[in-house]
UniProtKB/Swiss-Prot annotation:
Protein name as it appears in the record: Outer-membrane lipoprotein LolB
Function (record text): Plays a critical role in the incorporation of lipoproteins in the outer membrane after they are released by the LolA protein.
Protein's membrane topology: Lipid-anchor
Assembly behavior: Monomer.
Length: 207
């Protein structure tokens, strides 16, 4: 199988992205109990969203490679979503479309790949072991299958620790966008050993 060329994405300058600046800061104060009714209500409000989309800055950093890009994430239904990675000029480097039982990925040369597991396919084709199946929940501020997590003083996720398939992911939320209801994550960082994934969301559209 031909391998897609992601060199353009890897060579994008870090200066083209603003991953650390964010107008929303994490609330200070002691964390709240995961058993609190406020947290249960927040989770339910997020799960009630039928459609949503967000765009922003993405970075994957490891000893082997550094990838910087813009991203666009759109969920249109249960297990139906679209992920775009683009360079600063707006050209698409990767497009992924997923629906139940079928995932299609198109690289920057127009080569099309098909599989039934998006996480596995992205890992094989890009060399980035992104925990996409869990990230679909984490990016919404939901713990997914994780049971080890902490809340901030506004009853929202502040930190997750999750182990699966030999990976030990730690997720730290840097703030929330309170312009949307419910409030959605504004930036987050995932770490596993020597690899890091950073996401900064510019805005959210939720329905």
């Amino acid at each position: 199988m031909p391998q897609p060329d992601f060199r353009l994405i890897r060579l994008l300058p870090l200066a083209a992205l603003v991953l650390t600046a964010c107008s929303v800061t994490t609330p200070k104060g002691p964390g709240k109990s995961p058993d609190s009714p406020q947290w249960r209500q927040h989770q339910q409000d997020v799960r009630n969203l039928n459609q949503y989309q967000t765009r922003g800055a993405f970075a994957y950093i490891s000893d082997q490679q550094k990838v910087y890009a813009r991203f666009f994430w759109q969920q249109t239904g249960q297990d139906r979503y679209r992920l775009l990675l683009t360079n600063p000029l707006g050209s698409t480097e990767l497009e992924l479309n997923a629906q139940p039982g079928n995932v299609q990925l198109v690289d920057n040369k127009g080569q099309r790949y098909t599989a039934d597991d998006a996480e596995e396919m992205i890992g094989k084709l890009t060399g980035m072991p992104i925990p996409l199946n869990s990230l679909r929940q984490w990016i919404l501020g939901l713990p997914g299958d994780a049971t080890d997590y902490k809340l901030d003083d506004q009853y929202r996720l502040s930190e997750i620790t999750y182990s699966q398939n030999g990976k030990n992911w730690k997720v730290v939320y840097g703030g929330y966008d309170t312009k949307t209801q419910p409030a959605m994550p504004a930036n987050m960082e995932l770490t596993d050993g020597g690899q890091r994934i950073k996401l900064k969301m510019d805005n959210w559209i939720v329905k």
